[in-house]
């Protein structure tokens, strides 16, 4: 490829993959549920790539694996948009708003804390945000964390064989 692809180009690629008539047969039938194992798998590969970067200094694997994680975010967002739930722009907006809220020492007049204090402040802000979340959401989150742990164990076992 001779030209640099932009983020909008990438979004267009994902839309084309999901096109009901011309898209990829595999991508067209994916759902939020069917992609859950892929999301876990790609995150574990990204974590492994971070370890590899630390060990070797070679960034190529991390760059590739972050692209795979990005695919999961954009593909899940595309499916949600098709279902009328939310769009990738909504995901980006909400993620940005969260960063603004959780970094008042950067984005408001609040004094900058010592770096050791930041995780505690982050957690306090997160807990305040959680007040509106349901117990069902928290239960589902714990189930997802357990599924992710099982996938990591499976990958480690496969790697050691």
Which residues does each predicted region cover?
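Flexible "arm" and connector segments at domain edges
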Residues: 1-65, 71-161
């Amino acid at each position: 490829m001779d030209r640099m692809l932009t983020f909008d180009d990438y979004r267009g690629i994902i839309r084309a993959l999901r096109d009901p008539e011309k898209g990829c047969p595999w991508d067209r039938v994916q759902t939020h549920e069917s992609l859950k194992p892929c999301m876990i798998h790609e995150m574990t590969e990204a974590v492994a790539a971070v370890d590899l970067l630390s060990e070797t200094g070679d960034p190529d694997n991390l760059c590739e694996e972050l692209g795979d994680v990005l695919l999961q975010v954009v593909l899940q967002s595309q499916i949600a948009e098709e279902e009328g739930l939310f769009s990738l722009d909504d995901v980006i907006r909400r993620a940005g708003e969260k960063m603004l809220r959780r970094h008042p020492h950067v984005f408001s007049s609040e004094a900058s804390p010592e770096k050791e204090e930041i995780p505690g402040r982050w957690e306090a802000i997160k807990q305040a945000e959680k007040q509106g979340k349901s117990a069902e959401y928290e239960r589902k989150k714990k189930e997802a964390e357990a599924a992710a742990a099982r996938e990591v164990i499976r990958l480690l076992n496969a790697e050691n064989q």
